[in-house]
Amino acid sequence: MSTSPAGPWPAPAARGPLEATVALPGSKSLTARALLLAAVAEGPTTLAGVLRSRDTDLMEAALTALGARFEQLDGEAARLRARPAPLPLRVEAGPDGVGHVDVGLAGTVMRFVPPLAALADAPVVFDGDEAARARPLGPLLDALAELGAEVACLGEPGRLPVRVGPGDGALMRPADPAHPGRPHRVSVDASGSSQFLSALLLAAPLLPGGLAVTAVGRVPSLPHVAMTVAALRERGIAVDEPEEPVGPDAGCGGGRTWTVRPGRPAGGR
């Protein structure tokens, strides 16, 4: 059976000048970062201008699976009250003692949330749409394993599904017990995606002493890394940018009200 293709869509035409005020939704990229940072802040946070989409709904669900709580305010889907999860993050585990997160096709969920699972009280299995299984994840997983997290690929190496857990809890201890202020250190090949670098930066404030990250290779989408750094700084988190490593100081900003600004579509990076 065959069907003929649909004809052109008859777009409506105005009969005269239009005057209106349009409230633009927040940027998907900024919404993802705002949700994550609110989920691990030092106190409750109010978010305004939140973009509602499948990707951001999946991010909210993933963070809820790690202990954060989100409440819609005033009946507005774009306004949320976030209550952060304490460390170690409390996984909503099943009978097998493992949590499960559906990343869908959201690159921000599949890359930003696994570092948080390394700071949780139980392992988490990440999986998503069939197309998501074709997207690279290996460099981030390698970096997490280097930092001491438990990492296991349950299918093709460097691809979803993967299990990430705290291992022996190395990331929740100082990198150098004799010098508690010294940061953890790691290198990541971010040439395949700037999200690998952003993922580590977003988790960095939660590590005792912070994290110094060295990006290996040419990083694409540098504006999205700058977006991540700006989001951290706006919340009072110190970020140093020397020639090589990039490392936020430990300590996540306290809760307050944040408005997610509109932005141009950028693939949810």
Give the residues covered by each predicted segment.
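Structural preference for solvent-exposed beta-strand-turn elements
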Residues: M1-R269
